């Protein structure tokens, strides 16, 4: 199926955990819906923290979504009448999402993606840096540091209340029981070498 629209683009919303990425994605989707645009919302199957079927922000705002295991599945859910495609937790998808989202924008869709730009180690996370490079618009949000109240750009993983080691697995789906927002100065990663 080849679908061509008037104009398309890719918007990326990124930042640390608790910075409001999902909330901003939901806000943009609601505005598109108010404008009578047809919207399709997607999230990765791995993200089941708050709901199996919905994109849910940490403050409880939610929106029904299609749960997919691979970005290729997006194509199965869209049609010529679709105007906007929104994808939450984009960092959990493989490299193919970069090409899929770019192709969707090339075909005229407004594509909104949201995800973590850094992992708990403070390093670029998955596909997000490459999406930042190809997006027409990048919005980087900040949370509030749980230690000092300064703007927080990092995600602190905690294990039994202590900072996780650099050697721990990068992906661990969780929320406030496992993570906090931290500023540059209070972000700790034991065993990290500079």
Swiss-Prot record:
Reaction catalyzed: thymidine + ATP = dTMP + ADP + H(+)
Which Gene3D superfamilies would you find in this protein's record? 3.30.60.20, P-loop containing nucleotide triphosphate hydrolases
Residues binding ATP are 15-22, 88-91
Q: Which InterPro entries match?
A: P-loop_NTPase, Thymidine_kinase, Thymidine_kinase_CS
Q: Does the keyword Methyltransferase apply?
A: no
Output the Pfam families linked to this UniProt entry. Answer: TK
Query: Which Gene Ontology terms cover its molecular function?
Result: ATP binding; thymidine kinase activity; zinc ion binding
| Positions with a binding annotation for Zn(2+) | 145, 148, 183, 186
Active-site residues are: 89 (proton acceptor)
EC number(s) on file: 2.7.1.21
Biological-process GO terms, alphabetical: DNA biosynthetic process; thymidine metabolic process
Principal location listed in the UniProt entry: cytoplasm
Oligomeric state and interaction partners are given as: Homotetramer.
Q: What family is reported? A: Belongs to the thymidine kinase family.
| Protein name as it appears in the record | Thymidine kinase
Organism (species): Bacillus velezensis (strain DSM 23117 / BGSC 10A6 / LMG 26770 / FZB42)
Gene name as annotated: tdk
């Amino acid at each position: 199926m080849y679908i061509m629209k008037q104009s398309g683009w890719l918007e990326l919303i990124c930042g640390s955990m608790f910075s409001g990425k999902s909330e901003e994605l939901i806000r943009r989707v609601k505005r598109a819906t108010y404008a009578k645009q047809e919207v399709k919302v997607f999230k990765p199957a791995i993200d089941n923290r708050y709901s199996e079927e919905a994109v849910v922000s940490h403050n409880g705002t939610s929106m029904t979504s299609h749960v997919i295991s691979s970005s290729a599945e997006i194509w199965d859910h869209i049609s010529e009448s679709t105007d906007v495609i929104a994808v939450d937790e984009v960092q959990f998808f493989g490299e193919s999402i970069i090409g899929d989202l770019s192709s969707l924008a090339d075909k005229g869709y407004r594509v909104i993606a949201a995800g973590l730009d850094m992992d708990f180690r403070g390093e670029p996370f998955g596909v997000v840096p490459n999406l930042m490079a190809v997006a027409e618009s990048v919005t980087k949000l900040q949370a509030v540091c749980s230690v000092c109240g300064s703007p927080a750009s990092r995600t602190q993983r905690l294990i039994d209340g202590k900072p996780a080691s650099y050697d721990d697995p990068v992906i661990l789906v969780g929320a406030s029981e496992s993570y906090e927002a931290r500023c540059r100065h209070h972000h700790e990663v034991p065993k990290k070498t500079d």
